Amino acid sequence: ETTGLHPGFAFPIHASAAGKILWAYQDEDLLETELKRSHIKFQDKTKVNPDEVRVALKDSLEKGYGIHDEEWDQGVLAIAVPVFLGRKMPVMAVGIVAVKDRVLKKYSIEEIVEKLGKLRDKISPILEEA
């Protein structure tokens, strides 16, 4: 059972898909400052050790997407891809937050990432016009 999705809530960098992919691109000094802060261990899977968070961010950068797999809420999966809008650094992320069992019955993580990439490619020109 999930403890609930939280629309509109600001998710922490160490336990959110969007946070991981956005912070993966950040300047080392800024990242170091953030990693020195205390981070809450929401679930058993939540990484709070700065070295573990760093590994997760590096993994996100290498894969091209951020993922949180029950790190915030039990039974919840989130995946996010960066949106660059012509810049070197992402300005936002687009992603999904879903009940893990339900979404993985229909799609693999790779399929979700592919669909999110297509969505990003479709919305980027619209966002660039704004």
Task: Describe the predicted segments one by one.
Residues 17, 21, 30-34, 52, ...:
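Non-catalytic alpha-helical scaffold/packing segments enriched in small hydrophobic residues
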Residues 83-86:
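Sensor-regulatory modules in signal-transduction proteins
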Residues 91-130:
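Juxtadomain coupling helices with adjacent low-complexity linkers
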Residues 20-21, 77, 93-95:
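Residues embedded in well-ordered beta-strands
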